Amino acid sequence: MDGEELTEQETALYDRQIRVWGADAQRRLSKAHILVCGINGTTAEFCKNIVLAGVGSLTLVDDRVATEEALSANFLIPSDESVYGGKTLTELCRDSLKDFNPMVRVSVEKGDLSNFGGEFYSKFDVVVISCCSLSTKQKLEETIECQHNYPSFEESISVPWKALPRKMSKLYFAMRVIERFEDAEQRKPGEVSIADLPGVLKLKNEFCEAQSLKESHIPDALLERLVTDPREFPPVCPIIGGILGQEVIKAISGKGEPLKNFFFFDAMDGKGIIEDLSNNTGS
Protein backbone atom coordinates (compact mmCIF):
# COMPACT_ATOMS: atom_id res chain seq x y z
CA MET A 1 0.00 0.00 0.00
CA ASP A 2 3.04 2.30 0.02
CA GLY A 3 4.15 4.37 -2.93
CA GLU A 4 1.83 6.60 -4.91
CA GLU A 5 0.56 9.89 -3.57
CA LEU A 6 -3.07 11.00 -3.64
CA THR A 7 -4.25 12.58 -6.87
CA GLU A 8 -5.69 16.09 -6.91
CA GLN A 9 -9.14 14.57 -7.46
CA GLU A 10 -8.77 12.27 -4.44
CA THR A 11 -7.48 15.10 -2.27
CA ALA A 12 -10.46 17.25 -3.19
CA LEU A 13 -13.02 14.46 -2.74
CA TYR A 14 -11.67 13.25 0.60
CA ASP A 15 -10.80 16.69 1.97
CA ARG A 16 -12.96 16.41 5.11
CA GLN A 17 -11.71 13.02 6.22
CA ILE A 18 -8.11 13.95 5.43
CA ARG A 19 -8.54 16.68 8.04
CA VAL A 20 -9.62 14.00 10.52
CA TRP A 21 -7.03 11.26 9.97
CA GLY A 22 -4.41 12.85 7.73
CA ALA A 23 -3.20 12.48 4.15
CA ASP A 24 -0.98 9.47 4.88
CA ALA A 25 -3.89 7.48 6.32
CA GLN A 26 -6.04 8.41 3.33
CA ARG A 27 -3.27 7.36 0.96
CA ARG A 28 -3.13 3.96 2.63
CA LEU A 29 -6.89 3.61 2.29
CA SER A 30 -6.86 4.60 -1.38
CA LYS A 31 -4.34 1.84 -2.15
CA ALA A 32 -6.10 -0.89 -0.13
CA HIS A 33 -7.88 -3.82 -1.77
CA ILE A 34 -10.78 -5.29 0.21
CA LEU A 35 -12.52 -8.64 -0.29
CA VAL A 36 -15.98 -9.28 1.17
CA CYS A 37 -17.27 -12.86 1.06
CA GLY A 38 -20.96 -13.17 1.96
CA ILE A 39 -23.51 -10.39 1.50
CA ASN A 40 -26.11 -9.54 4.13
CA GLY A 41 -27.43 -6.41 5.81
CA THR A 42 -24.35 -5.98 7.98
CA THR A 43 -21.77 -6.42 5.24
CA ALA A 44 -23.82 -4.15 2.96
CA GLU A 45 -23.47 -1.39 5.57
CA PHE A 46 -19.76 -2.17 5.90
CA CYS A 47 -19.27 -1.96 2.13
CA LYS A 48 -21.02 1.41 2.01
CA ASN A 49 -18.77 2.75 4.77
CA ILE A 50 -15.46 1.72 3.25
CA VAL A 51 -16.49 2.82 -0.24
CA LEU A 52 -17.32 6.26 1.14
CA ALA A 53 -14.00 6.22 3.03
CA GLY A 54 -12.23 5.80 -0.30
CA VAL A 55 -10.54 2.40 -0.44
CA GLY A 56 -8.81 1.46 -3.67
CA SER A 57 -11.00 -1.47 -4.61
CA LEU A 58 -13.75 -3.69 -3.24
CA THR A 59 -14.41 -7.22 -4.49
CA LEU A 60 -17.64 -9.03 -3.62
CA VAL A 61 -18.17 -12.81 -3.52
CA ASP A 62 -21.64 -14.33 -3.10
CA ASP A 63 -23.43 -16.23 -5.86
CA ARG A 64 -26.80 -16.34 -4.11
CA VAL A 65 -29.72 -14.90 -6.05
CA ALA A 66 -31.50 -11.96 -4.40
CA THR A 67 -34.83 -12.72 -2.74
CA GLU A 68 -37.59 -10.59 -1.27
CA GLU A 69 -36.47 -11.62 2.22
CA ALA A 70 -33.04 -10.07 1.62
CA LEU A 71 -34.64 -6.67 1.05
CA SER A 72 -35.57 -6.26 4.71
CA ALA A 73 -31.97 -5.79 5.86
CA ASN A 74 -29.95 -4.97 2.72
CA PHE A 75 -30.60 -1.39 1.62
CA LEU A 76 -28.37 -1.80 -1.45
CA ILE A 77 -30.93 -4.03 -3.18
CA PRO A 78 -33.56 -2.13 -5.22
CA SER A 79 -37.09 -2.82 -4.00
CA ASP A 80 -38.44 -3.30 -7.53
CA GLU A 81 -38.61 -7.02 -8.34
CA SER A 82 -38.25 -6.24 -12.04
CA VAL A 83 -34.79 -4.89 -11.16
CA TYR A 84 -33.55 -7.45 -8.64
CA GLY A 85 -35.30 -10.53 -10.02
CA GLY A 86 -32.85 -13.19 -11.18
CA LYS A 87 -29.74 -11.20 -10.21
CA THR A 88 -27.21 -12.15 -7.57
CA LEU A 89 -26.73 -10.22 -4.35
CA THR A 90 -23.25 -9.16 -5.42
CA GLU A 91 -24.35 -7.84 -8.80
CA LEU A 92 -27.03 -5.66 -7.23
CA CYS A 93 -24.79 -4.41 -4.44
CA ARG A 94 -21.98 -3.64 -6.88
CA ASP A 95 -24.25 -1.45 -8.99
CA SER A 96 -25.51 0.47 -5.95
CA LEU A 97 -22.07 0.91 -4.39
CA LYS A 98 -20.62 2.42 -7.55
CA ASP A 99 -23.07 5.30 -7.15
CA PHE A 100 -21.76 6.06 -3.66
CA ASN A 101 -18.21 6.67 -4.85
CA PRO A 102 -17.30 6.28 -8.55
CA MET A 103 -13.59 6.49 -7.67
CA VAL A 104 -13.64 3.12 -5.91
CA ARG A 105 -13.39 0.05 -8.15
CA VAL A 106 -16.18 -2.34 -7.16
CA SER A 107 -16.20 -5.76 -8.81
CA VAL A 108 -17.79 -9.20 -8.46
CA GLU A 109 -15.96 -12.53 -8.31
CA LYS A 110 -18.04 -15.60 -9.03
CA GLY A 111 -17.34 -18.96 -7.44
CA ASP A 112 -17.35 -20.86 -4.17
CA LEU A 113 -15.02 -19.85 -1.35
CA SER A 114 -13.66 -23.37 -1.05
CA ASN A 115 -12.42 -23.23 -4.65
CA PHE A 116 -10.23 -20.16 -4.19
CA GLY A 117 -6.61 -20.76 -3.31
CA GLY A 118 -4.03 -18.74 -1.43
CA GLU A 119 -2.94 -16.91 -4.57
CA PHE A 120 -6.42 -15.42 -4.95
CA TYR A 121 -6.60 -14.18 -1.36
CA SER A 122 -3.06 -12.78 -1.48
CA LYS A 123 -4.29 -10.00 -3.78
CA PHE A 124 -6.19 -8.40 -0.91
CA ASP A 125 -5.14 -6.40 2.12
CA VAL A 126 -8.28 -7.22 4.12
CA VAL A 127 -10.66 -10.18 3.85
CA VAL A 128 -14.09 -9.96 5.50
CA ILE A 129 -16.02 -13.22 5.85
CA SER A 130 -19.75 -13.56 6.54
CA CYS A 131 -22.60 -15.99 5.90
CA CYS A 132 -20.38 -19.07 5.96
CA SER A 133 -20.13 -22.10 8.21
CA LEU A 134 -17.70 -22.66 11.07
CA SER A 135 -15.76 -25.26 9.08
CA THR A 136 -15.46 -22.88 6.13
CA LYS A 137 -14.03 -20.15 8.37
CA GLN A 138 -11.51 -22.59 9.78
CA LYS A 139 -10.42 -23.73 6.31
CA LEU A 140 -10.12 -20.15 5.07
CA GLU A 141 -7.91 -19.23 7.99
CA GLU A 142 -5.52 -22.00 6.96
CA THR A 143 -5.50 -20.70 3.38
CA ILE A 144 -5.19 -16.96 3.93
CA GLU A 145 -1.77 -15.63 4.86
CA CYS A 146 -2.07 -13.17 7.74
CA GLN A 147 0.26 -10.69 9.37
CA HIS A 148 -0.99 -9.95 12.86
CA ASN A 149 -0.20 -10.01 16.54
CA TYR A 150 -3.70 -11.06 17.52
CA PRO A 151 -4.82 -14.63 18.24
CA SER A 152 -6.16 -16.45 15.19
CA PHE A 153 -9.83 -17.35 14.97
CA GLU A 154 -9.02 -21.00 15.67
CA GLU A 155 -6.88 -20.11 18.70
CA SER A 156 -9.61 -17.87 20.08
CA ILE A 157 -12.46 -20.35 19.88
CA SER A 158 -10.19 -23.08 21.28
CA VAL A 159 -9.69 -21.31 24.61
CA PRO A 160 -11.31 -23.54 27.29
CA TRP A 161 -14.54 -22.03 28.53
CA LYS A 162 -13.40 -22.34 32.15
CA ALA A 163 -10.48 -20.04 31.30
CA LEU A 164 -12.71 -17.25 30.00
CA PRO A 165 -13.71 -14.27 32.17
CA ARG A 166 -16.57 -14.98 34.56
CA LYS A 167 -18.55 -12.08 33.11
CA MET A 168 -18.05 -13.26 29.53
CA SER A 169 -21.04 -12.45 27.31
CA LYS A 170 -23.51 -15.34 27.24
CA LEU A 171 -23.93 -14.60 23.53
CA TYR A 172 -20.50 -16.09 22.87
CA PHE A 173 -21.39 -19.46 24.36
CA ALA A 174 -24.82 -19.53 22.73
CA MET A 175 -23.38 -18.69 19.31
CA ARG A 176 -20.72 -21.39 19.63
CA VAL A 177 -23.44 -23.96 20.34
CA ILE A 178 -25.64 -22.88 17.42
CA GLU A 179 -22.66 -22.69 15.08
CA ARG A 180 -21.64 -26.24 15.99
CA PHE A 181 -25.22 -27.41 15.53
CA GLU A 182 -25.40 -25.86 12.05
CA ASP A 183 -22.08 -27.44 11.14
CA ALA A 184 -23.11 -30.89 12.40
CA GLU A 185 -26.41 -30.69 10.53
CA GLN A 186 -24.72 -29.27 7.42
CA ARG A 187 -26.85 -26.13 7.62
CA LYS A 188 -25.95 -22.70 6.36
CA PRO A 189 -25.74 -19.87 8.94
CA GLY A 190 -29.23 -18.89 10.01
CA GLU A 191 -30.86 -22.11 8.79
CA VAL A 192 -32.23 -23.00 12.20
CA SER A 193 -35.74 -22.73 13.59
CA ILE A 194 -37.68 -23.35 16.78
CA ALA A 195 -38.10 -26.96 15.63
CA ASP A 196 -34.34 -27.40 16.15
CA LEU A 197 -34.43 -26.24 19.78
CA PRO A 198 -34.40 -29.76 21.33
CA GLY A 199 -31.29 -30.66 19.33
CA VAL A 200 -29.63 -27.35 20.16
CA LEU A 201 -30.33 -27.79 23.89
CA LYS A 202 -28.97 -31.34 23.77
CA LEU A 203 -25.76 -30.08 22.17
CA LYS A 204 -25.55 -27.31 24.76
CA ASN A 205 -25.67 -29.85 27.58
CA GLU A 206 -22.93 -31.88 25.89
CA PHE A 207 -20.80 -28.75 25.51
CA CYS A 208 -21.24 -27.78 29.15
CA GLU A 209 -20.35 -31.27 30.33
CA ALA A 210 -17.22 -31.34 28.15
CA GLN A 211 -16.20 -27.88 29.40
CA SER A 212 -16.99 -28.70 33.06
CA LEU A 213 -19.63 -25.98 33.32
CA LYS A 214 -23.15 -26.04 34.69
CA GLU A 215 -25.89 -26.35 32.08
CA SER A 216 -27.39 -23.13 33.41
CA HIS A 217 -24.25 -21.31 32.21
CA ILE A 218 -25.98 -20.93 28.83
CA PRO A 219 -29.59 -19.85 29.39
CA ASP A 220 -32.13 -21.94 27.49
CA ALA A 221 -34.16 -18.77 26.94
CA LEU A 222 -31.26 -17.17 25.06
CA LEU A 223 -30.86 -20.17 22.75
CA GLU A 224 -34.61 -20.23 22.17
CA ARG A 225 -34.59 -16.56 21.22
CA LEU A 226 -31.72 -17.04 18.78
CA VAL A 227 -33.23 -20.04 16.97
CA THR A 228 -36.80 -18.70 16.94
CA ASP A 229 -35.93 -15.93 14.49
CA PRO A 230 -32.33 -16.13 13.24
CA ARG A 231 -32.85 -13.46 10.58
CA GLU A 232 -30.99 -10.18 10.73
CA PHE A 233 -32.60 -7.36 12.70
CA PRO A 234 -32.39 -4.40 10.27
CA PRO A 235 -31.81 -1.63 12.87
CA VAL A 236 -28.73 -3.48 14.14
CA CYS A 237 -27.05 -3.78 10.73
CA PRO A 238 -25.84 -0.14 10.57
CA ILE A 239 -24.41 -0.46 14.08
CA ILE A 240 -22.38 -3.61 13.42
CA GLY A 241 -21.50 -2.55 9.88
CA GLY A 242 -20.31 0.81 11.18
CA ILE A 243 -18.11 -0.75 13.85
CA LEU A 244 -16.68 -3.25 11.37
CA GLY A 245 -15.89 -0.45 8.94
CA GLN A 246 -14.22 1.56 11.70
CA GLU A 247 -12.00 -1.37 12.73
CA VAL A 248 -10.96 -2.16 9.15
CA ILE A 249 -10.11 1.50 8.56
CA LYS A 250 -7.96 1.40 11.72
CA ALA A 251 -6.13 -1.68 10.47
CA ILE A 252 -5.44 -0.17 7.05
CA SER A 253 -4.65 3.41 8.04
CA GLY A 254 -2.63 2.63 11.15
CA LYS A 255 -4.72 5.16 13.06
CA GLY A 256 -5.48 3.28 16.26
CA GLU A 257 -5.41 -0.38 17.25
CA PRO A 258 -8.31 -2.57 16.04
CA LEU A 259 -10.39 -4.00 18.86
CA LYS A 260 -9.21 -7.27 20.35
CA ASN A 261 -10.82 -9.44 19.33
CA PHE A 262 -14.58 -10.24 19.54
CA PHE A 263 -17.50 -7.79 19.53
CA PHE A 264 -20.98 -8.81 20.68
CA PHE A 265 -24.12 -6.73 20.33
CA ASP A 266 -27.38 -7.69 22.00
CA ALA A 267 -30.38 -5.99 20.40
CA MET A 268 -32.46 -6.75 23.49
CA ASP A 269 -30.56 -4.31 25.71
CA GLY A 270 -28.78 -2.28 23.02
CA LYS A 271 -25.34 -2.94 24.51
CA GLY A 272 -22.14 -3.76 22.66
CA ILE A 273 -19.35 -5.65 24.41
CA ILE A 274 -15.71 -6.20 23.42
CA GLU A 275 -14.22 -9.47 24.65
CA ASP A 276 -10.57 -10.54 24.48
CA LEU A 277 -10.48 -14.26 23.71
CA SER A 278 -6.93 -15.53 23.86
CA ASN A 279 -4.77 -17.94 25.79
CA ASN A 280 -3.81 -14.99 27.99
CA THR A 281 -7.43 -14.46 29.01
CA GLY A 282 -7.80 -14.20 32.74
CA SER A 283 -10.74 -14.89 35.04
Predicted regions and their residues:
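Adenine nucleotide-associated cytosolic modules
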Residues: M1-S283
